[in-house]
Swiss-Prot record:
Cofactor(s) needed: Mn(2+)
Gene Ontology cellular-component terms listed: cytoplasm
Gene, per the UniProt record: sodA
Substrates-to-products reaction catalysed: 2 superoxide + 2 H(+) = H2O2 + O2
Keyword Manganese: yes
Protein name: Superoxide dismutase [Mn]
GO molecular function: metal ion binding; superoxide dismutase activity
Pfam family, one: Sod_Fe_C
Function according to Swiss-Prot or TrEMBL: Destroys superoxide anion radicals which are normally produced within the cells and which are toxic to biological systems.
Organism: Salmonella typhi
Cofactor binding: number and manner: Binds 1 Mn(2+) ion per subunit.
């Protein structure tokens, strides 16, 4: 089995004016495709790992051959992270129900959560991701470098937990529209969070 680039469940311009069409198309067809291609190349002679779903593979990086660990950390990580990212974007959904209640419980308020998430995204130096994760029965905000995922665990990524939603803060995710204004990009994210997808991920793990 080889990994394939997932189709987006919306058109490239569906998130306008918040996320622009050109960035979405390049991000999906060029950047994400490259992670898929590189992960597949690294797995060519590793059948015991090539058949794993990518979300499972990145939890087992300590088991892959040493000469493949970094390339799979970066590229299988990139494939997993972007696959989650695309599903987590949609205009017009509302934070409600059990996930909203859990956010209010664990952060004090939705506004407090957003402020903590924005800080994690804005202060991640260089390239990386900000995440809302479920750790046990508690929600937390974490960030990771490069294409690391909380699913990789603390020893590899410095973070842990099951991702509920994630935000890509690599410059390729926003530079065409926002240039160096990462905080503006982060603010626009709230207009396109797919809270239905986040709620489904939360419900599946709580």
């Amino acid at each position: 089995m080889s990994y394939t680039l997932p189709s987006l469940p919306y058109a490239y311009d569906a998130l306008e004016p918040h996320f622009d069409k050109q960035t979405m198309e390049i991000h999906h067809t060029k950047h994400h495709q490259t992670y898929v291609n590189n992960a597949n190349a690294a797995l060519e002679n590793l059948p015991e790992f090539a058949d794993l779903p990518v979300e499972e593979l990145i939890t087992k990086l300590d088991q892959v051959p040493a000469d493949k660990k970094t390339v799979l950390r970066n590229n299988a990580g990139g494939h997993a992270n972007h696959s989650l990212f695309w599903k987590g974007l949609k205009k017009g959904t509302t934070l409600q129900g059990d996930l909203k209640a859990a956010i209010e419980r664990d952060f004090g308020s939705v506004d407090n959560f957003k402020a903590e998430f924005e800080k994690a995204a804005a202060t991640r130096f260089g390239s990386g991701w900000a995440w809302l994760v479920l750790k046990g029965d508690k929600l937390a905000v974490v960030s990771t470098a490069n294409q690391d995922s909380p699913l990789m665990g603390e020893a590899i990524s410095g973070a842990s937990g099951f991702p509920i939603l994630g935000l890509d803060v690599w410059e390729h995710a926003y530079y065409l529209k926002f240039q160096n204004r990462r905080p503006d990009y982060i603010k626009e994210f709230w207009n396109v969070v797919n809270w239905d997808e986040a709620a489904a991920r939360f419900a599946a793990k709580k």
